[in-house]
Amino acid sequence: MEDKPKFAFVGNSHMAFWALNVYFPQWECLNYGAPGEGLAYVESFHEDTSDCQVVIQFGSNDIYQLNEENTDDYVERYVKAVLAVPSRKTYLFCIFPRNDYDDYSTAVNKFIQILNRKIHEKLQGTDIVYLDVFNRLLQDGRLNPELTLDDLHLNGKG
C-alpha cells in the first residue's frame, strides 16, 4: 500500500473550516487552521511539519491593524513567518478578498491587493509557491457573493 502524500494546512479560519478530507481524500491532511488568527499565530507556529507539504493562508484578520506606515514591517514579518514553517514544499495563498461594508466599498480589497503585491515581491527568489487567486475571487472589486458563505469565508465553489 502506498503512503498518502502528507499535507499540513496552516493559517486562519479559511484553513480551519476547509473540509480537507472531503476535497482531498487522496492526501493525509493535518489541519492547523485557527479561526480569528493571523500573523502572530504563524510567527509562533511550532508544529513539526518538516515531513509535509504545507499550505498556508492568513492575513485577513490582521487587515484593520495595518496602515500605510506599518505595511512594510508587516510584509517583512509575514514573509519571515512563512519561511520559518518547516516543510518539504510550501504553498502560500494570497490574502483573500473580503466584503466588509454594506455600501459595496472596494477599499479594503484595494488595500489587500497592495499587500499581496508586496508579499509576492518579497517572496521572489525563495522556494515558496505563491498561489495568487485574488482576482479569481473578485466580482466588481468585491468578493464574489457566489463564492462566499458570509462575505468573508469561501464556500465549496470558492
Language-model features and meaning:
Residues 1-53:
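Serine-esterase "nucleophile elbow" of acetyl-processing enzymes
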Residues 1, 157-158:
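Charged phosphate-binding loop/patch that engages nucleotide di/tri-phosphates or the phosphate backbone
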Residues 24, 43-157:
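Alpha-helical cap/lid subdomain in secreted, periplasmic
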